[in-house]
């Protein structure tokens, strides 16, 4: 592996780790970092390049699974109650997570080919960034005017399903899965931290499943000499995502979504200018 290849793998892994769980759209940032700047597709065939993006996403998924390991073990019945609300009888269940996953899973299955073929343009992603920013600003405005649930253990099935409906917006590239679901959670009555917790926990099965399916699809395009390149990207994505998720969860109730919305609008405008 050349120095440039190592640099490319590291940068793309860092970008993935920074943006996968922050509500800023990892797709938009990967377009800037890869399609416009580094062009990893020139280092390998398109299928292998897609496989690399799946692998670094798996690094991010592993990071969030580690952050929520106690919660996951509790969901699986392998750990006793770990929070005060759980001791009072409130608890997030696998069924609630499933309810939240169904809408986007169904729409994604039905329209995957259409989305891949027609919606993955720079301009479409830019508009998604701006539209997602508007939703986030609306969520923060609503949050100031209503009481909210301060823990994910108190989420209802209705709220879980509504968050799942908002997640469908993330099928629009650039909208951001975490942006749409955190904003949706806030709109239906969760505080920012509870909405983020539900978003990240819900992300683990849906992202892991989608990533593994894509990896199987592109498996034949891989070769052993790509392993160092993939490993560098995976490690960078994992380490950075681990830090970002912990930092984000500590701050989100304080900073809300406005700073991310402003950043998204600026990035969307930059992307529109780049393709004019």
From Swiss-Prot:
Compartments, as annotated in UniProt: Cell membrane
Function comment: Catalyzes the dephosphorylation of undecaprenyl diphosphate (UPP). Confers resistance to bacitracin.
Keywords carried by this UniProt record: Antibiotic resistance, Cell membrane, Cell shape, Cell wall biogenesis/degradation, Hydrolase, Membrane, Peptidoglycan synthesis, Transmembrane, Transmembrane helix
UniProt similarity note: Belongs to the UppP family.
Protein name, entry field: Undecaprenyl-diphosphatase
InterPro entries listed in its UniProt record: UppP
Keyword Transmembrane: yes
A GO BP entry: response to antibiotic
Molecular function per GO: undecaprenyl-diphosphatase activity
Enzyme class: hydrolase
Reaction catalysis annotation: di-trans,octa-cis-undecaprenyl diphosphate + H2O = di-trans,octa-cis-undecaprenyl phosphate + phosphate + H(+)
Domain of life: Bacteria
